[in-house]
């Protein structure tokens, strides 16, 4: 091992020693041409791995960047540049170095949204490359101004920039669906669900293979898709969408029926603003209750509730007359109550100043009159009240 390393270091010059790192190359002895491929256990430098060792005659897999894979080894070997066949071939460091981007080939960044699209949602730059499948929408409310001016004919004509023509042959291997988007070749996964709402400035067909599920394009497999508009409430239609849009002067009778409507619903009247097939129902009219169904609330009959006087009033007057006392009946029992004074008060019968001799005799009568007067104030006869009428109210 040491002798092999010293011999290889002696063969190298000072100009070739650009990298001092070493890699272990362990080719497995699974073929008969072992001595031609070198010692199975050896340490070789990365700069001299293809010059110091003889070339092996085993099968190699080569790609576009001159990388060859040794099937019987545990490492990747770089093929040496052939000096006789291609004298103008650049060195390996220039081949592997990334090329500076051409400013003409860079995609133009999307223009900032106008004031009309201030409410548009923000989308990352990577997601703005997805192209949704365009479906015509005949709505005249949310159509952008440039398409409305071209379709109506009456407004100012805004010049519409057509996308650049690209010479590329695209195979359409699968019918487009709602989830089929145009993606670069290095994105094999399906686009996210909210990419369907991305507006589209230029309609470009996509191709996909049903076996692998990857998107392919013959001429534009490495070039990114053109920059698209971000999320917006107003859909931006493709350049070929003007023939589906009804003009501003069109009427339901003059404009043709759209092809995506069901056959059974083509005779329904069309809406002027939105393509709704249920315009026969007047959805804008409020459904009010009929007058017959409305039941009138029962009113309170206060005359019926107050048709009887206080109970016990007549009994109080009769008891006062039977006793023969000079005490007048209380003010609330008289038909025409006199003004309140010291001689005519509600509690006159109970608040008179009595002597000590008469206090014991009049004690029982006084308490009875107080209890009776309280009953007349608080108690009423609710027998004739209509309780059902009160509960309904």
From Swiss-Prot:
Keywords: Acetylation, Phosphoprotein. InterPro entries: FAM53. The modification Phosphoserine is found at residues 122, 162, 232, 234, 255, 273, 299. Residues 204-215 have a biased composition (Polar residues). Residues 77-120, 141-167, 204-283, 343-365 are annotated as: Disordered. The keyword Acetylation applies. The modification N-acetylmethionine is found at residue 1. Residues 241-256, 343-355 have a biased composition (Low complexity). It comes from the Eukaryota. Belongs to the FAM53 family. This is Protein FAM53C. It comes from Mus musculus. The lineage of its organism: Eukaryota, Metazoa, Chordata, Craniata, Vertebrata. The gene is Fam53c.
């Amino acid at each position: 091992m040491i002798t092999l390393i010293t011999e290889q270091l002696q063969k190298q010059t000072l100009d070739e020693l650009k990298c001092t790192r070493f890699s272990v190359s362990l080719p497995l002895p699974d073929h008969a041409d072992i001595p031609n491929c070198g010692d199975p256990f050896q340490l070789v430098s990365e700069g001299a791995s293809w010059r110091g060792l003889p070339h092996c005659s085993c099968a190699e897999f080569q790609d576009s960047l001159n990388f060859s894979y040794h099937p019987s080894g545990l490492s990747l070997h770089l093929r040496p540049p052939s000096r006789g066949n291609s004298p103008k071939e650049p060195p390996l460091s220039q081949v592997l170095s990334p090329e500076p981007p051409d400013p003409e080939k860079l995609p133009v960044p999307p223009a900032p949204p106008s004031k009309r699209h201030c409410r548009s949602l923000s989308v990352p730059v990577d997601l703005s490359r997805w192209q949704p499948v365009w479906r015509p929408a005949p709505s005249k409310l949310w159509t952008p101004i440039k398409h409305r001016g071209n379709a109506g004919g009456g407004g100012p004509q805004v010049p519409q920039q057509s996308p650049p023509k690209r010479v590329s042959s695209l195979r359409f291997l699968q019918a487009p669906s709602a989830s089929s988007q145009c993606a670069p070749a290095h994105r094999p996964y399906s686009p996210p669900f909210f990419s369907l709402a991305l507006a589209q400035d230029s309609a470009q067909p996509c191709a996909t293979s049903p076996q692998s599920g990857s998107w392919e394009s013959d001429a534009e497999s490495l070039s990114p898709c053109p920059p698209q508009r971000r999320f917006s409430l107003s859909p931006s239609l493709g350049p070929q969408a003007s023939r589906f849009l009804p003009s501003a002067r069109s009427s339901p009778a003059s404009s043709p029926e759209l092809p995506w409507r069901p056959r059974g619903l083509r005779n329904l009247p069309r809406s002027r603003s939105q393509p709704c097939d249920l315009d026969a129902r007047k959805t804008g009219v409020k459904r009010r209750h009929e007058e017959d169904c409305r039941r009138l609330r029962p009113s309170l009959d206060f005359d019926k509730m107050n048709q009887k006087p206080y109970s016990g009033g007549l009994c109080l007057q009769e008891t006062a007359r039977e006793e023969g006392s000079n005490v007048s009946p209380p003010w609330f029992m008289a038909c025409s109550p006199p003004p309140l004074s010291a001689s005519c008060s509600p509690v006159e019968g109970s608040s008179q100043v009595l002597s000590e001799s008469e206090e014991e005799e009049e004690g029982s009568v006084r308490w009875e009159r107080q209890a009776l007067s309280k009953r007349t104030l608080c108690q009423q006869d609710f027998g004739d009240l209509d309780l059902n009428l009160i509960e309904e109210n």
